[in-house]
Regions:
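Glycine-rich phosphate-binding loops that contact phosphosugars or nucleotide phosphates
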Residues: 12, 17, 22-154
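Glycine-rich phosphate/diphosphate-binding loops that line cofactor/substrate pockets in enzymes
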Residues: 1-9
Length: 155
């Protein structure tokens, strides 16, 4: 419903999870499988100037929360991807997004972390192996994109 109502999907994560953020955002802005209108999705992991300036001036823990503060509006969706479920910068982004009335979706590993506690919805992969968790995260990302293609494609 968020996309149908003109809201934006924001994604954040570190390392391989940052790559997943960029991959999922690209599938939404471009297309996944079905031809449909371009959808507003932004990976908060891509702007080198923002990433380095915020990290330098405020610390890496705020690299996503400062962007969320500036960009996210009530009703937007923030997807936080973290294999540990406790990445401090993703947790901070969730805290800021929650205060702004965003919908929070977490994608984590099996541990009960802060991201799972804060998320409205959390996909927890039942593994402690980083590679297996990341593989499941991109499959889940593709499933989300396929569902969105189906729903938005019907408009």
């Amino acid at each position: 419903n968020a996309l149908k109502n003109g809201r934006v999907i924001f994604l954040c994560g570190n390392g391989g999870s940052a790559a997943d953020c960029q991959h999922i955002a690209a599938e939404l802005v471009g297309r996944f499988v079905t031809e449909r209108r371009s959808l507003p999705a932004i990976a908060l992991t891509t702007d080198t100037s923002n990433l380095t300036a915020i990290s330098n001036d405020y610390g890496y823990e705020q690299v996503f929360s400062r962007q969320v503060e500036a960009l996210v509006r009530e009703g937007d969706v923030v997807i936080g991807i973290s294999t540990s479920g406790n990445s401090k910068n993703v947790v901070r982004a969730f805290e800021t997004a929650k205060a702004k009335g965003a919908i929070l979706i977490g994608m984590t590993g099996e541990k009960d972390g802060e991201i799972a506690k804060q998320a409205n919805i959390c996909l927890k992969v039942p593994s402690a192996v980083t590679a297996r968790i990341q593989e499941c995260h991109i499959i889940a990302g593709h499933m989300i994109c396929a569902y969105i293609d189906e729903v938005i494609g019907l408009e």
